[in-house]
């Protein structure tokens, strides 16, 4: 029996019944009902990540502290008393502490770039790993390739993934120019020229094999030069070709210079050239096959042209799959807190995920002071922006501080005006926000030890092993005393105990890590949300106020509840309503004592398709399902008249009502440029409840124009 989808009313049947009623052979290609696709949570959705700066973590071999090159700090970059130079941490030391990370409850480690560095530049050393010059092997300050492989092997034995920080935007600062001037020169002022001195439009040749041949003396505003000693210092060899760099001067971090300018003087790669694209794919594919690593964090992603990522990332993922890495995690550093900006890297630039700078801003704001709940609501309502057929916000690495901006403890200590007790309480609340909210939480090493630092960058990169930096010996620590000459590994901190307990709780209750997150109820300073997976509902309530707060919270599971985390909280249950008083600056987690089964008849309505005011370049696909039971709504689209449906993405939770957002919506967003302008598309919504019952919406049409 053929079904005309345009006239189809809502179907509500189980998957098995649907298969029986609609045999494939009886349906024409144009009218085939698509199969439901569940939400894709992403490779990192079940992970918690411990971020290590290798040089500052543990010194396992003092023989490599100077990289085997004697001669002092200006030669080898070693100065253990200066926060801007190498201190001696290495792979051997990290290997010896992997069990410590495992025992904290983490599932992955992320390490700073391990490649060979341009050791000294601009009055500092490359201990951090972001000034690479030989990307084919490891820096001798950190150890040998065999020691790196041993670290990865030991991590795998302990059940830890190894995520490596990589850079595709730039290399260390080796290239100068014949004028000795480094202010940015715009394309309008001096466009690129080919090797014969003819101007060409860069946009017309990005990534294409007919990219014009360039000449060092004729193609750039200021001819690049390099010293004889550094002529072949970089590896792979294509990095020594001076025409493989933009050579336009220092970025102003605005306009075109954000892509084409040198990042603080670092040599900016000409990632529009196919030679560079091919070289980078080969380079970073080799690290997967050679060292057996499990993921990449990609530095300075926003400063590289989108075409590069759309070529690079699929090839890297292909290499990982061939190497048996089905869950190879990739996330980009896009230093921007706006979800509309961040999500473009997922929707339009092939990134599986990005670091959640929006969470960093709003999660931190919630933890360090009261009255910030609306910002968290807006953040979580925007999670739909990241939903695709293969990814969602559940796989985004979340964090509250890092090696660049500074430690979360520094932000909180400043906000509490140095009140030590309040700083500890709010730091514990910050951990609750980080670990119980959706996403893959990232803890910056030392945060569990109460490290603070008086600012970002160098000041936030303390030694975990006994430090020779006097100011770090004397520095205030949350929940503890100054470290002095001791190793941080020898001091137990209340934050460390708390984090271990949270990770243990989540390991026993995986819904708290990878389950659906549904906002339930808020007040000025408290927020409550359900975490749900496989019939089990949990309720997380966080209160940032210095006073207790009482909430009446609707839930889906008609059950009695038990408290599994937090201080003394009074709560009562009446049907599907939990009334609870949460103590000041604290968190409570409740667990339903019985599992949930669907009772409502399922149906789904697909709203009119249109551009959303908040995302003028994307189509908003919105659907509603009556009631408040846990359902997933899958959206699929196809070119009108074709038989093949394509999965757009799946929503597993409803929007929360605000002044700007209508509540109760299941949403995903479609990027129109995946279709040719003038194309009419058809869209259908498919809902599935906990009983695996399926409902189909009517099909809606939309004509793509741009």
Show which residues each predicted segment covers.
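Short, flexible loop/turn elements at secondary-structure junctions
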Residues: 53-56, 115, 139-142, 168-170, ...
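Short, solvent-exposed loop/turn elements at domain surfaces
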Residues: 57-66, 406-409, 472-474
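Active-site clefts of carbohydrate-active enzymes
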Residues: 392-420
